């Protein structure tokens, strides 16, 4: 049949073209994309196209080079779990409702270091994302950090502070955090004045550098339910999977510890590695709202693991039978990994590009009226298609007069209760069965609404976790069944001891309030092997923060688990006792006649599964490929376990939280000698004094010097590294310093500061210039040589005792690369320096003298680092907090700031991962 026929007037009508035009109109859809500058751009695409087509159009519109960090998130998803547009699936299968479709352009993968982003424009997009997330309460932020971040944002937009232009109230048109306090602007203005000279790019870089330290930075949350029908949050991030309940982080599962992630129907499973001290595999199970939410979480885990942990994505199945006849999902992340993205950025990025920044708009993304946007977007002149040329990033009109407020729940500690991940003892015949009454789920914007607060916010703090969407549906209690027998009566049991029910055990479940009685005795060193955090003074329940492998806490039955809440200690209610009191109660158990510690805990309920598999294999599973780190020192179990815990603590922030809780001065230690009138002038700082019990005594009538002995014993070896930690000499204490050096027989001095930093004298020059000699009382010091590099200096000296007519050779090593403020950006130079110190002291028994300015901060960092290296060489686990505690037992305040502690922890992890120091077959050398 021909498509053309002749009309009487001699004209033609093209039927086929009309049919195609009609079909094209039916298959083209409009997609409204909310960009990070709060503008909406409409694009027209074919609904049969893959998602990658729409992504490419958006990337082209933004002229974005480093694309793999970003994605499109469905704005009108009806679940509480965010869904990303899959680039490999047709658009019509992902966007079910009618056109126009609404999506948010967002950062999908948050890098751990902004230096990995090669283009300033990419960092600007990150900056917009985080700023918006903090403003809407999606990303919680302490007020002091929020003020710092806001000051960098102001510097980026307004430039340098100008007293004549930036009058009082110049920030009144801006909103930075939910429920912004009245004095918040003053704090921002004060910090803004300190950023003079920073360009917009530098200010934004500093913004990202500060934001990456936030607890919830880069965490993608998915809502789930526990066995008691309580809400929990499952967070997916670069380092692994987090579990939150009642706004308290309950568990962290690093990719290092995960063997497999899978799901079946509405059940999501995490299978953990079997450790050497464990007898059974561990399988964790979680209930999701529906099948799609479960698969969404699973895909998020696959994508995050592949992007951050692998060098390249796994290749697709090439075998015909393996591809078409295997059960489960064939989904694989196929974009670039972080390693590939960084390399691509280095090769393709245009670091000199110029773009226009958008002025701030206080309106939040959640206030976007998608209905109005949808109506406006249907106008043809507002559409872009893939045929349009690329544009420069769109500008934005100034709307500073707008205002934004948002209800936010106040951050409050909560009783942890028991986190029922419903991990249960299960035989192969058992299966998960969940039941739910039919219900509807309210459609909401992907930007989560804040739930009504039960308390009036007092401090303007944003919520600790993303605010929960309101929902109409309600979930019924989830039951587990074994054949015809209902197991609901057993769901409150806290531990399933593998013995006959007739036999009683010394430990076991208490029927009331789901409590568990745990008994243990200390090891030969008087330790139980667990740490706790919280207390009445911290307004937090007392929670078990760490259980060391192979210790009494780990081996007792029932086992004490991380996340368990301690209710009673030896029958004593600790609800109104401080953290230090709780620790003393635990330690006092070692001194009692029975020597037994009895704990009543509300369990975290992470239990082992008898069998690895269910009745049938899960429908979808993902077995993470091993990253290079996984294969390091596999045989050194205890050492490897401690490194995993350290990496986990750095990611989650528990490392710094535990450091903050550690006493700065050991209880019961006195410092009376330092406060005697004749000694006060010998202290560089009024509040930094040596313990009386461990101070170095000089011979003679005036025996005082601000210095302490510090001995660090390395277990399973004969090594005891001896140090003298002291302050940097003052002009009138140089004689005392050299007297101490002579009397202690020290042949090496380690100096960790320059003489002047930021205009302040940190240490007097207590040695002569090269080829010169100087006298200090009865001691003459001659400097023979001075060599070095930009990071450190070696000086060879002779110390001559004029009274005894004796001389000794000594070496001074000075580290000069420590910045005036903060800590080094890279630990490489410092680690080289520590290695040189170790080489110089090899075979020497006498103590080495270590000092900075106060003799506590950088001095503590060096001692911690060398101790950790020795522990690694001896195949011993490394727990930095224990090292700091040992040092503070001998000199107060060792390692002065959290940034110093984080620096040394990261350096220890680097030494282990990169093989800087390796376990030795013998441990005779220091």
Curated annotation (Swiss-Prot):
Matching CDD domains: FERM_B-lobe, FERM_C_PTPN4_PTPN3_like, FERM_F1_PTPN4, PDZ_PTPN3-4-like
Catalytic activity: O-phospho-L-tyrosyl-[protein] + H2O = L-tyrosyl-[protein] + phosphate
Entry EC number(s): 3.1.3.48
Ligand binding (substrate): 820, 852-858, 896
Domain PDZ: 517-589
InterPro entries in the record: Band_41_domain, FA, FERM/acyl-CoA-bd_prot_sf, FERM_2, FERM_central, FERM_CS, FERM_domain, FERM_N
UniProt GO molecular function: cytoskeletal protein binding; glutamate receptor binding; non-membrane spanning protein tyrosine phosphatase activity
Localisation: Cell membrane; Cytoplasm, Cytoskeleton
Residues annotated with Phosphoserine modification: 474
GO cellular component: cytoplasm; cytoplasmic side of plasma membrane; cytoskeleton; membrane
Region named Disordered: 379-412, 429-474, 492-511
Active site feature: 852 (phosphocysteine intermediate)
Membrane topology type: Peripheral membrane protein
Domain of life of the organism encoding this protein: Eukaryota
Phenotypic consequence of gene deletion: PTPN4-deficient mice are born at normal Mendelian ratio with no apparent developmental or phenotypic defects. They display normal cytokine production and T-cell effector functions. However, they show impairment in motor learning and cerebellar long-term depression.
Any Pfam family hit: FERM_N
Expressing tissues: Highly expressed in testis. Specifically expressed in spermatocytes and spermatids within seminiferous tubules (at protein level).
Domain (Tyrosine-protein phosphatase) ranges: 655-911
Segments forming domain FERM: 29-312
Record key words, sorted: Cell membrane, Cytoplasm, Cytoskeleton, Hydrolase, Membrane, Phosphoprotein, Protein phosphatase
Biased composition (Polar residues): 398-408, 432-455
Family that this chain belongs to: Belongs to the protein-tyrosine phosphatase family. Non-receptor class subfamily.
Function: Phosphatase that plays a role in immunity, learning, synaptic plasticity or cell homeostasis. Regulates neuronal cell homeostasis by protecting neurons against apoptosis. Negatively regulates TLR4-induced interferon beta production by dephosphorylating adapter TICAM2 and inhibiting subsequent TRAM-TRIF interaction. Dephosphorylates also the immunoreceptor tyrosine-based activation motifs/ITAMs of the TCR zeta subunit and thereby negatively regulates TCR-mediated signaling pathway. May act at junctions between the membrane and the cytoskeleton.
Listed name of the protein: Tyrosine-protein phosphatase non-receptor type 4
Phylogenetic classification of the source organism: Eukaryota, Metazoa, Chordata, Craniata, Vertebrata
Gene transcribed to yield this protein: Ptpn4
């Amino acid at each position: 049949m021909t498509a053309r026929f002749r009309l009487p007037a001699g004209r033609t009508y093209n039927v086929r073209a009309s049919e195609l035009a009609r079909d094209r109109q039916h298959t083209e859809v409009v997609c409204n994309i909310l960009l990070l500058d709060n503008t909406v751009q409409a694009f027209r695409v074919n609904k049969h196209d893959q998602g990658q087509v729409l992504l490419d159009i958006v990337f082209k519109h933004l002229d974005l080079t480093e694309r793999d960090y970003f994605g499109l998130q469905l704005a009108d998803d009806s679940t509480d779990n965010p869904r990303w547009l899959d680039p490999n699936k047709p658009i019509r299968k992902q966007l079910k409702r009618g056109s126009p479709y609404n999506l948010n352009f967002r950062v999908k993968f948050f890098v751990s270091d902004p230096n990995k982003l090669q283009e300033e424009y990419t960092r600007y997009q990150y900056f917009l994302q985080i700023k918006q997330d903090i403003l809407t309460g999606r990303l919680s932020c302490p007020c002091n950090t929020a003020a710092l971040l806001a000051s960098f944002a102001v510097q980026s937009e307004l430039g340098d502070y100008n007293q004549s232009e930036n009058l009082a109230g110049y920030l009144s048109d801006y909103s930075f955090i939910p429920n912004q306090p009245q004095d918040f602007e003053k704090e921002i203005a004060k910090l803004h004045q300190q950023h003079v000279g920073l360009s917009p790019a530098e200010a934004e870089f500093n913004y990202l550098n500060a934001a990456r330290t936030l607890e919830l930075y880069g965490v993608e949350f998915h809502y789930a339910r526990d066995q008691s029908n309580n809400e929990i949050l499952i967070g997916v991030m670069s380092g692994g999977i987090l579990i939150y309940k009642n706004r308290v982080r309950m568990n962290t599962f690093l990719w290092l510890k995960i063997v497999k992630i899978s799901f079946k129907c509405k059940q999501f499973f995490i299978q953990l590695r079997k450790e050497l001290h464990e007898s059974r595999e561990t399988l964790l199970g979680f209930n999701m709202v529906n099948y799609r939410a479960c698969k969404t979480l699973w895909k998020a885990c696959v994508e995050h693991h592949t992007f951050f942990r692998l060098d390249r994505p796994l290749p697709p199945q090439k075998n015909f039978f393996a591809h078409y006849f295997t059960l489960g999902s064939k989904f694989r992340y196929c974009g670039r990994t972080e390693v590939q993205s960084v390399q691509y950025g280095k090769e393709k990025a245009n670091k000199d590009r110029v773009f226009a920044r958008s002025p701030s708009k206080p309106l939040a993304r959640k206030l976007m009226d998608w209905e109005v946007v949808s109506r406006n977007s249907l106008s043809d002149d507002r559409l872009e298609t893939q045929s349009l040329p690329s544009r420069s990033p769109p500008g934005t009109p100034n709307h500073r007069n707008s205002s934004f407020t948002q209800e936010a729940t106040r951050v409050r500690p909560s009783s942890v209760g028991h986190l029922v991940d419903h991990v249960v003892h299960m035989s192969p015949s058992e299966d998960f069965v969940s039941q739910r009454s039919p219900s509807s789920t309210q459609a909401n914007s992907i930007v989560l609404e804040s739930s009504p607060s039960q308390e009036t916010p007092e401090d303007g703090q944003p919520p600790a976790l993303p605010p929960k969407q309101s929902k109409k549906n309600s979930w019924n209690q989830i039951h587990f069944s074994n054949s015809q027998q209902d197991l609901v009566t057993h769901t409150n049991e806290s531990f399933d001891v593998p013995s006959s029910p007739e036999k009683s055990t010394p430990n076991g479940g208490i029927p009331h309030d789901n409590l568990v009685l745990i008994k243990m005795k200390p090891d030969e060193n008087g330790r139980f092997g667990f740490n706790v955090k919280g207390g009445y003074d911290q307004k937090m329940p007392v929670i078990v923060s760490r259980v060391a492998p192979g210790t009494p806490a780990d081996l007792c039955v029932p086992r004490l688990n991380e996340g368990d809440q301690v209710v009673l200690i030896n029958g004593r209610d600790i609800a109104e006792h401080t953290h230090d009191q709780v620790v003393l109660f635990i330690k006092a158990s070692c001194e009692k006649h029975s020597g037994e510690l009895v704990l009543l805990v509300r369990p975290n309920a992470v239990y082992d599964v008898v069998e690895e598999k269910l009745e049938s294999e899960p429908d979808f599973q993902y077995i993470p490929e091993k990253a290079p780190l996984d294969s390091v020192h596999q045989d050194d179990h205890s050492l490897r376990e401690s490194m995993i815990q350290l990496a986990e603590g750095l990611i989650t922030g528990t490392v710094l939280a535990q450091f903050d809780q550690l006493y700065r001065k050991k209880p019961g230690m006195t410092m009376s000698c330092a406060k005697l009138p004749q000694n006060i002038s010998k202290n560089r700082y009024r509040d930094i004094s040596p313990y009386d019990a461990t101070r170095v005594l000089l011979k003679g009538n005036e025996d005082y010097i601000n210095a302490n002995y510090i001995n660090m014993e390395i277990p399973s070896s004969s090594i005891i590294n001896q140090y003298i930690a002291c302050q940097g000499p003052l002009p009138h204490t140089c004689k005392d310093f050299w007297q101490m050096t002579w009397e202690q027989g020290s042949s090496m001095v380690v100096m960790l500061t320059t003489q002047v930093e930021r205009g302040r004298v940190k240490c007097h020059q207590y040695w002569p210039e090269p080829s010169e000699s100087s006298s200090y009382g009865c001691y003459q010091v001659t400097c023979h040589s001075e060599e070095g590099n930009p990071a450190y200096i070696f000086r060879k000296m002779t110390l001559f005792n004029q009274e005894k007519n004796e001389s000794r050779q000594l070496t001074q090593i000075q580290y000069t690369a420590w910045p005036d403020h903060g800590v080094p950006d890279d630990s490489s130079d410092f680690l080289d320096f520590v290695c040189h110190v170790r080489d110089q002291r090899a075979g020497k028994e006498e103590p080495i003298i270590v000092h900075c300015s106060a003799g506590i901060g950088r001095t503590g960092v060096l001692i911690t680092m060398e101790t950790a290296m020795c522990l690694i060489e001896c195949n011993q686990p490394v727990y930095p907090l224990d090292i700091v505690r040992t040092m503070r037992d001998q000199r107060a305040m060792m390692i002065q700031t959290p940034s110093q502690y984080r620096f040394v922890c990261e350096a220890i992890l680097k030494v282990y991962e990169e093989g800087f120091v390796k376990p030795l077959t013998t441990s005779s050398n220091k």
